[in-house]
């Protein structure tokens, strides 16, 4: 099924609505989060496992928007995410955390944190995760909390 709140943009081309994945046996779970991918399943993974389409060596940005009311003060964001193979988080295009690049790139096993106390704007904001796929299935799962004071 599609997750209409999350969009994707592939570095190699293509944009659209993210697809909710079945859980890959190696993927860690995150309370309240679902793994998403960029494509409906159309490869051998579908018949064997049904958990996503491979996109070898591609970078995929997954984004979700949120709105801060006019006059919002002291906005902050904290959260955790998993990415296959690794990922970086961004608030309105500015980096806010991510996985270190390692030879194994096990971002689907080890979570990364994101946090921001600045970079918010009144109105529309965008939280994005740029995921690097080193081969095979890829995706992202995230859970964030956004707080602010509204006078």
Feature annotation, model-predicted:
Residues 55-57, 71, 118-122:
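Extracellular/lumenal carbohydrate-interaction signature centered on repeated Trp-anchored short motifs
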Residues 43-61, 99-109:
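Extracellular beta-rich ligand/substrate-recognition surface
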Residues 92, 110-112, 142:
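Surface-exposed beta-strand edges and their flanking turn/coil or helix-capping segments
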């Amino acid at each position: 099924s599609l997750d209409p709140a999350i969009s994707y943009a592939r570095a190699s081309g293509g944009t659209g609505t993210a697809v909710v994945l079945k859980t890959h046996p190696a993927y860690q779970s995150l309370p309240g989060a679902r793994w998403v991918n960029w494509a409906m399943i159309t490869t051998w993974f579908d018949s064997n496992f049904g958990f996503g389409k491979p996109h070898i060596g591609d970078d995929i940005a997954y984004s979700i928007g949120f709105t801060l009311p006019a006059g919002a003060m002291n906005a902050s964001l904290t959260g955790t995410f998993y990415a296959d193979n690794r990922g970086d988080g961004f608030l309105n295009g500015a980096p806010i955390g991510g996985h270190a690049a390692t030879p194994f790139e096990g971002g689907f096993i080890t979570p990364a944190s994101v946090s921001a106390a600045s970079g918010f704007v009144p109105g529309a904001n965008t939280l994005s995760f740029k995921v690097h796929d080193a081969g095979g299935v890829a995706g992202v799962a995230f859970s964030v909390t956004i707080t602010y004071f509204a006078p």
